[in-house]
Amino acid sequence: MRKLLIFLAGLAVVIAVAGETILPRWAHDTAETLLHEAGAEEAETMLHTSPGVLLLFGQIDDISASAKGLRLGQLRLDRAELRGADVRLDAPALFLDRKVHVKSAEELKLTGTVSAESLRDLLARHVDKLDNIEVALDEEGVHATAQAKIFGRKADILLEGKIVEEPDALFFHMTRFDIKNAAFGKANIGDFFGDILITKLSALPLKAQIDSVEHRDGAVVVRLSCRNPR
């Protein structure tokens, strides 16, 4: 019995030490690895849980992370900031499948900043008739100029739009489409461009809601938060 008690006491010490040293380092490295796998070119994370052994059950008391190049659906975020408190992850999915599923959180917010270059890349990928795309951003929205061949003639295109939210998705929505220097009469703009789905919220690793989309000079800021706080 005495040997068993000594063994159990030693095991408890090992678990306690691992919980305060090995597990936090492993969790930190895993978080940064997952951010890189999600497209981040640079990533920094800080997380804290006490006692540390609770990390084995997916419990994170506080987390903050910043990343460059993280992808939100079809958009590259030039900067992404994540803040969370009392976050509970699906531990089996994290450890066995390396997938992040948020079960609950007292607070979990993501702020992403989108540049003109990111929106230019979005338009270039989804509108194959447009060339030489240039994009500018201000408080009114997205302003783009481009060129396109329409009915064999080169035309100058002026396109405007906004990133808009719906209850279950984020879109790029066109608000203006002008064609200049094209002697073919009125064009059907639906043939050349339509709304672009950026992401469905159901595709994100947490049940999220879009809090706001703010168009600024030189950037668009998108804010999301966990939809089912405890």
What are these regions (language model features)?
Residues 59-60, 164-169, 218:
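Short, solvent-exposed coil/turn segments at beta-strand boundaries
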Residues 114-190, 194:
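Soluble extracytoplasmic domains of inner/organellar membrane proteins
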Residues 4-20:
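Hydrophobic membrane-insertion alpha-helices, especially the h-region
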Residues 184-230:
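Extracytoplasmic/luminal low-complexity segments enriched in Pro/Gly and acidic/polar residues
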Residues 16-50:
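N-terminal amphipathic/hydrophobic interface segments
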Residues 40-133, 137-150:
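N-terminal beta-strand/beta-hairpin edge segment
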